[in-house]
Curated annotation (Swiss-Prot):
Necessary cofactors: Mn(2+)
Cross-referenced InterPro entries: Fe/Mn_Superoxide_Dismutase, Mn/Fe_SOD, Mn/Fe_SOD_BS, Mn/Fe_SOD_C, Mn/Fe_SOD_N, Mn/Fe_SOD_N_sf, SOD_C_sf
Species for this entry: Debaryomyces hansenii (strain ATCC 36239 / CBS 767 / BCRC 21394 / JCM 1990 / NBRC 0083 / IGC 2968)
Record note on cofactor: Binds 1 Mn(2+) ion per subunit.
Family that this chain belongs to: Belongs to the iron/manganese superoxide dismutase family.
EC numbers: 1.15.1.1
Keyword match Flavoprotein: no
GO molecular function terms listed in the Swiss-Prot or TrEMBL record: manganese ion binding; superoxide dismutase activity
An annotated GO cellular component: mitochondrial matrix
Subcellular location: Mitochondrion matrix
Name of this chain's protein: Probable superoxide dismutase [Mn], mitochondrial
Catalytic activity from the UniProt record: 2 superoxide + 2 H(+) = H2O2 + O2
Lineage, top ranks: Eukaryota, Fungi, Dikarya, Ascomycota, Saccharomycotina
Residues binding Mn(2+), per UniProt: 36, 84, 173, 177
Length: 211
């Protein structure tokens, strides 16, 4: 690895999870979580760090064309890392209140009722958007800082992520590696099951931090 200050500043690491791999069962198997975290997420971390190192080298050599190509890898692997960090935070076992809807006395709960009528309706809309993703991608429940703090459900393809003014509250991975070992090609069952372990408390904190 390069010892340059720029690389050291930009290096990322695989985060530790707040729960055991098997603690989301039966909704998401421990094996899926272990492979997803240790293998897939780690690949994005390694790819990003490698691309940063290559970029520093290309810039030091004045190789603009190479630097432009490398930046695409940085975007892909950096997006993969960013999305997965939020994905893990979006999940929690039932013992940590995973799946427990935000109360009507919370700011997020009030906003959901105001815009969607019920949390179940928001979930249905999110699942419909997840099902509409062709290939690999993500769905995010977001707060729009420039639209009166209104909520929305947006999707991205591959490892594209959301940026300002959108604040991601919940991220759901629609890549096959997130569900295929357990749900095979019936991804609708995965989309339905994951809400049993969604960390609404974390979503509420993120909502409140951008009031």
């Amino acid at each position: 690895m390069s010892n340059s200050p720029a690389f050291g500043k930009n290096k990322i690491e695989l985060p530790q999870l707040d729960w055991a791999y098997d603690s989301l069962e039966p909704y998401i198997s421990g094996k899926i979580n272990e492979i997803h975290h240790k293998k897939h997420h780690q690949t994005y971390v390694n790819g990003y760090n490698s691309a940063i190192e290559q970029l520093i080298e290309a810039e030091s050599q004045g190789d603009v064309k190479k630097a432009i190509v490398i930046q695409q890898n940085i975007k892909f692997h950096g997006g993969g890392h960013t999305n997965h960090v939020l994905f893990w935070k979006s999940l929690a076992p039932n013992s940590q209140n995973g799946g427990k809807h935000p109360g009507s006395d919370t700011n997020l709960g009030k906003k959901i009722i105001e815009q969607y009528g019920s949390i179940d309706n928001l979930i249905s809309i999110t699942n419909a958007k997840l099902a509409s993703i062709q290939g690999s991608g993500w769905a995010f429940i977001v707060k729009n800082k420039q639209n009166g703090g209104n909520l929305d459900v947006v999707t991205t393809y591959n490892q594209d992520t959301v940026t300002d003014p959108l604040v991601p509250l919940i991220a759901i991975d629609a890549w096959e590696h997130a569900y295929y070992l357990q749900y095979q090609n019936v991804k609708a069952d995965y989309f339905k099951a994951i809400w049993n372990v969604i960390n609404w408390e974390e979503a509420s904190k993120r909502f409140d931090s951008h009031l």
